[in-house]
UniProtKB/Swiss-Prot annotation:
UniProt function note: CRISPR (clustered regularly interspaced short palindromic repeat) is an adaptive immune system that provides protection against mobile genetic elements (viruses, transposable elements and conjugative plasmids). CRISPR clusters contain spacers, sequences complementary to antecedent mobile elements, and target invading nucleic acids. CRISPR clusters are transcribed and processed into CRISPR RNA (crRNA). The type III-A Csm complex binds crRNA and acts as a crRNA-guided RNase, DNase and cyclic oligoadenylate synthase; binding of target RNA cognate to the crRNA is required for all activities. Csm functions as a non-specific ssDNase. Base-pairing between crRNA and target RNA to form a ternary Csm complex activates a ssDNase activity; target RNA cleavage suppresses the ssDNase, a temporal control that prevents uncontrolled DNA degradation. Viral RNA transcripts probably tether the Csm complex to the viral genome, recruiting Cas10 ssDNA activity which is able to degrade DNA in the transcription bubble, spatially controlling the DNase activity.
Keywords of this entry: Antiviral defense, Endonuclease, Hydrolase, Nuclease, Nucleotide-binding, RNA-binding
Protein name (record): CRISPR system endoribonuclease Csm6
Regulation: Non-specific ssRNase activity is allosterically activated about 1000-fold by cyclic hexaadenylate (cA6), a second messenger produced by Cas10 of the ternary Csm effector complex in the presence of a cognate target RNA. ssRNase activity is inhibited by physiological concentrations of ATP (1 mM), activity is restored by cOA.
EC number: 3.1.-.-
Region (HEPN domain): 146-428
GO biological process: defense response to virus
Stretch list, region CARF domain: 1-145
Effect of T107A: About 100-fold reduction of ssRNase activity in presence of cOA
Name of the encoding gene: csm6
Similarity comment text for this entry: Belongs to the CRISPR-associated Csm6 family.
InterPro entries attached to this UniProt entry: CRISPR-assoc_prot_Csm6, Csm6_CARF, Csm6_HEPN
Amino acid sequence: MKILISAVGTTDPISNNHDAALLHIARNYRPDKIVLVYSQEMMVKQDLINKVLLSIEGYNPIIEIDSTILNNDEVFLFDKMYEVMGQIVQKYTNDDNEIILNLSSGTPQIISALFALNRINDYNTQAIQVATPKNRANREYTALTESEIDALIMENQDNRLDFVDRSIKDKSEKFTQALVKRHLRSLIASFDYQAAEAIINRKEYNKLLSKKKIAYIREKLYDFSRVFKNQSILSDILSFPLDDSQKKALNYYLMIDVLKEREHIADVLIKAKSLAEFVIEETIKKDHEGLIVFDGNLPKLNPSFPDCEAILDDIDKKMKKSRGIEDTEERIFSVQSTLNLLSYLNILEFYEYDSQLQTAINGILSLNGERNKVAHGLSEIDTRLLSRKKLKQLSENLRLLLVDCLGIDSSYFNYYDKQNKELIKMLE
C-alpha cells in the first residue's frame, strides 16, 4: 500500500488559487491512504481538508487522522518533532507499505524532522517537496523606504533592554540518539562488535534505550568481543547441549565465519587449517583410541598402536610420491614426525573414511600455500587466488567437518546472523 504521511500546514489545502503541498502530492502520487497529522491549531481544518482531497476527480483515498495531535507549543521544537513524527512514521512502516513523506507542509521543524527521518532511518520512504506556483517564496519581499525601516525598528517590541528571551537551545537529544542507533546498527550488521561495544558503553548513551535493553545489548557485545580478543567461548555456546570438543569447534568456526564476512582473509586462512586439524584429530582420537600420542603439545603416531607401521608406510609412500623421490628407501616420515592436516588426511584415507569428508579436507589443503605465506612470512595475499567464492567454499568445507565428524547440528551455524537481527531490531 502506498501511504502519504503529511502534517497539515497553514497554507493547506489551497493557496493563491493553486494546490498547496498536501493536495498537490495527493493529486500527483495518488496514494492509497493519506495519514494526516494535525496540530491543535490546525484541527479546525479537518472538514475542509477532507472535502478538498476527495474533490480530486477519479480518486477516493482512505483518509486517516493520526491519533497524535501536535501541541501548539511544541511544533517549533525540532527534537520533539523528530521524536513524535518518527513514532508516527514507524507506526505505518512495514515491508508491504511504501511511505511518502510531505516535506513542504507544517512548521520548518516538522519538515526538517521528516527530512532527517527519511535520510537516517532505513524506511521504505520517498520524500516529496512541492514548489510554489511562482517557484519562489510564498510571501514576496517589498523593499522598504528609509522612514518605513525606521518605523519598523521603533515599533519592534523586542528592541528594548527588558525584552523577553524566546530563544530555545535545542540539544537534539532524540536526533543524536537516532544517529547513534543508526551507526550501531551499521556496525553490528558488518560484524564490528568491538567498535559497537566501545560506543554503546559510553556514559552519555545510558539513556539510548531502556535500562533493560541497554544492559542486554552491552552484555551481548561484550560477549562477542571477548571471542575475537581472547578466543573465549560464547556464553550461549556454553549452555548448548554439546560436549567440550563440539563447543570449542563451533565457537572457533563461528569466529572464522565472521572474519570471512569482514574480509580478514589472513586470519581466516590461518584459523581454518587449525580448526580442521582440531576436528580431524578429535575424530581419529575417538575412532582409533591410542593411535595419537602427544610429545608436549605435538601430536605423533603411537609406535605401540597395532596399525602404526602400516600407517607409517602409507604416509611415507605418499610423501615420497608428492616430492618425486619414490626410489628413496630411507623413511622420511617416522614416529618422530609431527602430525598435521595432511598426515591426518592420509590416516583417514588409510581407514577409508567417507570420500566427501576427504574432498572437504583437500579443499582446505588447497589453500595451504597462501596460508603458509601469511603464517610464516610477510607476503601479501594473492586475492586472485582467494575469491569470495573460494572463501565461501572453505566455510562450507569446515561446516561439513563439524557436521560429519563432530555431529554438530547445522542450525547453530547462523548464530551471529540471528543475534545481529535481534540487536538491530532493538536499536530501531
